[in-house]
């Protein structure tokens, strides 16, 4: 509230200190077993559950640990390396007989079911509950909502500070950093607080279901849709690997032929002779010089963000009415985009069964339609190109 913000700025509200009493972690099998036994004995109405993984897809990664809270006052992070058969059996019973609260259930359930075979007959999703009241894309993440709706906002900062320092010290970029590089003592507080905050968000958001219309949408569309899309993602999208490889080769042949056609244009040959180097069709600087300075085409007036004359598709299409070079460049770009964006991207990401497993999202649009993201946005596949078909 406004009053709380003012009070915090004035120093009247102290920072919440997160310690072992609130967020604990264990790599000890007996400590983990005792906590799970206590949860089973308590027979809670619901349990918040989260996973930490070293990948975004169950087939491409494994689970590092799980975090749980059944009070909202404290949580635990358990390293999966300390699991034994008894712990897995007890967790299976706990999840099967308790309402389980996730934040982004589709992600977590996929890992739990794929790697452990756990079942979740009764689950809820705080991310989808929030989407019910705010359909704008973005802003549904656990960290953003925890900052807004719980006393524990920014609990992830120490861990992300460590990650930034580690990447700088070891020369790693975001793509090369793996979640399992994070030491247990750094991870445990962050992970346990994920579960605590998920629990607290559910306590706040579950009141949304007092509205019968919103409850119907949630119970009959969002939750069943979450399960359906999780299964669809697990099934994957089938591709014929051999046909993709053939198409990749055909497209490269088309690109090479289009480039050769461009290099045969007299104006391009003369430009290369004058410049003393080969013309690179991917260089916008060379392209501007060729089109506007050497050939003498009139700029359309459209500018880039830096104020230079634009050579985007719209401009090339317009200039193509006056000269062949813009048409040839546009043709090369279109073919290269299809090859680079789709064919080159799909083939290395196919699983052994020749299926691509990407994401389908319920909460990604304001209109309520599905969206796709991840390895490949399936909604952006061009429909009219014969090679793609």
Model-derived segments and spans:
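Conserved "right-hand" nucleotidyltransferase catalytic core of DNA-directed polymerases
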Residues: 1-80, 137, 148-150, 158-386
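Short, glycine/acidic-enriched loop or turn micro-motifs at the edges of active sites
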Residues: 53-55, 106-107, 128
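Conserved beta-strand -> loop -> alpha-helix junction used to position metal-binding or nucleic-acid-contacting
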Residues: 118-135, 141-147
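Conserved beta-strand scaffold positions in the cores of enzyme catalytic domains, especially
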Residues: 75-77, 100, 121-125
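Acidic beta-strand-to-loop metal/phosphate-binding motif
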Residues: 48, 98-105
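Short, basic/hydrophobic alpha-helical segments
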Residues: 34-39, 84-98
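Short active-site oxyanion
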Residues: 95-100, 276-278
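Phosphate- and divalent-cation-binding pockets in alpha/beta enzyme and binding domains
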Residues: 108-114, 290
């Amino acid at each position: 509230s406004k009053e709380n913000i003012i009070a915090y700025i004035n120093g009247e509200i102290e920072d919440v200190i997160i310690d072992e009493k609130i967020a604990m972690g264990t790599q000890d099998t007996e400590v983990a077993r005792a906590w799970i036994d206590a949860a089973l004995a308590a027979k809670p109405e619901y349990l918040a559950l989260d996973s930490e993984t070293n990948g975004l897809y169950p087939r491409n990664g494994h689970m590092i640990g799980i975090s749980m809270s059944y009070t909202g006052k404290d949580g635990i992070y358990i390293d999966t390396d300390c699991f034994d058969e008894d712990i897995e059996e007890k967790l299976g019973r706990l999840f099967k007989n308790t309402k389980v609260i996730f934040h982004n259930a589709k992600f977590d359930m996929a890992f739990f079911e794929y790697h452990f075979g756990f079942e979740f007959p009764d689950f809820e999703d705080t991310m989808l509950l929030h989407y019910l009241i705010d359909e704008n894309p973005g802003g549904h993440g656990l960290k953003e909502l925890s900052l807004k709706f719980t006393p524990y906002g920014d609990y992830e900062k120490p861990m992300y500070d460590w990650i930034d320092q580690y990447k700088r010290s070891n020369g790693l970029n975001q793509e090369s950093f793996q979640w399992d590089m994070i030491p247990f003592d750094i991870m445990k507080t962050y992970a346990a607080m994920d579960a605590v905050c998920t629990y607290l968000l559910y306590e706040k958001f579950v009141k949304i279901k007092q509205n019968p219309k919103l409850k119907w949408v949630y119970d009959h569309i969002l939750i069943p849709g979450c399960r359906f899309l999780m299964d669809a993602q697990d099934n994957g999208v089938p591709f014929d690997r051999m046909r993709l490889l053939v198409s990749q080769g055909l497209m490269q042949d088309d690109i090479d032929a289009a480039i050769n056609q461009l290099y045969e244009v007299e104006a391009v040959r003369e430009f290369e002779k004058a410049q003393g180097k080969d013309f690179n069709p991917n260089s916008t600087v060379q392209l501007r010089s060729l089109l506007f300075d050497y050939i003498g085409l009139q700029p359309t007036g459209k500018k880039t963000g830096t104020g230079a004359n634009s050579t985007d598709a719209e401009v090339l299409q317009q200039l193509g009415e006056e000269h062949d070079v813009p048409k040839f460049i546009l043709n090369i770009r279109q073919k290269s985009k299809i090859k680079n964006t789709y064919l080159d991207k799909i083939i290395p990401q196919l699983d052994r069964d020749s299926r691509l497993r990407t994401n389908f999202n319920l909460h990604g649009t304001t209109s309520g339609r599905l969206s796709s993201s991840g390895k490949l946005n399936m909604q952006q596949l061009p429909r009219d190109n014969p090679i793609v078909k």
